[in-house]
From Swiss-Prot:
This is Amyloid beta precursor like protein 1. Pfam families: APP_amyloid, APP_Cu_bd, APP_E2, APP_N. Residues 214-287, 492-546 are annotated as: Disordered. It comes from Homo sapiens. Residues 310-342, 410-441 are annotated as: Heparin-binding.
Amino acid sequence: MGPASPAARGLSRRPGQPPLPLLLPLLLLLLRAQPAIGSLAGGSPGAAEAPGSAQVAGLCGRLTLHRDLRTGRWEPDPQRSRRCLRDPQRVLEYCRQMYPELQIARVEQATQAIPMERWCGGSRSGSCAHPHHQVVPFRCLPGEFVSEALLVPEGCRFLHQERMDQCESSTRRHQEAQEACSSQGLILHGSGMLLPCGSDRFRGVEYVCCPPPGTPDPSGTAVGDPSTRSWPPGSRVEGAEDEEEEESFPQPVDDYFVEPPQAEEEEETVPPPSSHTLAVVGKVTPTPRPTDGVDIYFGMPGEISEHEGFLRAKMDLEERRMRQINEVMREWAMADNQSKNLPKADRQALNEHFQSILQTLEEQVSGERQRLVETHATRVIALINDQRRAALEGFLAALQADPPQAERVLLALRRYLRAEQKEQRHTLRHYQHVAAVDPEKAQQMRFQVHTHLQVIEERVNQSLGLLDQNPHLAQELRPQIQELLHSEHLGPSELEAPAPGGSSEDKGGLQPPDSKDDTPMTLPKGSTEQDAASPEKEKMNPLEQYERKVNASVPRGFPFHSSEIQRDELAPAGTGVSREAVSGLLIMGAGGGSLIVLSMLLLRRKKPYGAISHGVVEVDPMLTLEEQQLRELQRHGYENPTYRFLEERP
């Protein structure tokens, strides 16, 4: 038998060495335990998780796992404990136990579940009943809370929600962000928590919503925003205008805007009679989104169409407001976390400071928004007046042609009536907006708005009266004009409907109490509404009537003045005024004065103590001295409730 190997000789010669049969079972146990431990550490770092981030995960009845900061692999609990990691406070305690060197201050549940392979729960057998699991780990975060920085890709929207009265988990806040994006037809790209209020509890969430893949969004604006609509050159936008008319009037002040004049629908190929008409009809062309729509709108008017520029400026103003509020909220959250150890009075002062900053910011944005609306309204009024003047010039040119062509006259009349209709629509929308915001102010301007609409109707009737100078043309176009007037009519009778947000007193509209329903405008037969209002007026000869109507139709007549509505809104500026027009205005003024006097008399009669006479009053000698003094005091306007029983005494 050969000599033994050196290793065998060493084992047999060393004193106190355990025999070989005892070492073999120990080695087998170690070899069996190694695959079991390796199965628990088999989970690899997810694609969305950093390899060195501190995290814990656990399922009820299985070994609790934690991430190794050096390798990024999941390791089992050293004490082989099985915990149900559901309570955030228990998760925080376990994180501090696993990572004592990191000074864990808070925990946050991940937004995505990760696969955990061969999670056998410490089974020593070679097989697992359920080897694969999906688990949502908890992140162990050291230090104070800092909101996560989110990337906003091109074409996406950055939004946030704060609810100071609700303290929800991060999972619930993440679901709210998903629901908010889904309600707008978008998908959630990323989210971050705001304003912590406990362990894994937050009062707000910020998130990024992006359009679904394959959705074209070249301008990078919000999906569904009206400013993203682009019209090819030469296209008709009358349909979009009609759709906007069908929508209900917006209630909030921020959403109020005045519809601008758009390109008219022209079915005929007859060229416009004036080159000025071509300059008025705006052409909406797609333009790239400006860097700052507010500055572009105020600084460089006319770069793009008025309606598109206003919508973009309003959207950019809201985006700027959201960015500023988000920055203030972040600073507030950081200051609140840093001031936890300060006295209560100091923390209260800090909160009041940030509240004042937010209030100042809101006031600045509100003033900018009001300035934006007023500028837009002023520009729209100017556009409406220019378009109306151009349409009236075209109508007069078509009538004065030799010989006048019925087709051109009808086309020019349609343009003119639509221009007047836009002014009526603008007046109605302005009144409805004021009624929704300030009912008292709307009550004060009711008479002015009603008078304005009446002036527009009179102006239209006088323009239609010019057709009587050509009886053959008037007879030929009478059916078409009647149909056109019926479709385009929008006068004071439209104010019968209650304005949005108005009180029950406004349900009567702007119609005076003694007025009847306005009938649709009809083609005049040699007379106007002023002639009908004063039947005692003698009828003028055709030449004088024609001169009067031409002077009234061209931008010269009806110098209606109002404190709420500028003169340019009611009638074109001019110099020539006929005597008949002045007489009509005087009659209207006298009627208005009579209504005011009657209203004052009715109000005075409604007083509880009757009218106070300031003339000579005959003293009844049968009255006592006290009653005579009471009469004298009441005559000078003094009303003392103490003496009321004397009046009621028989």
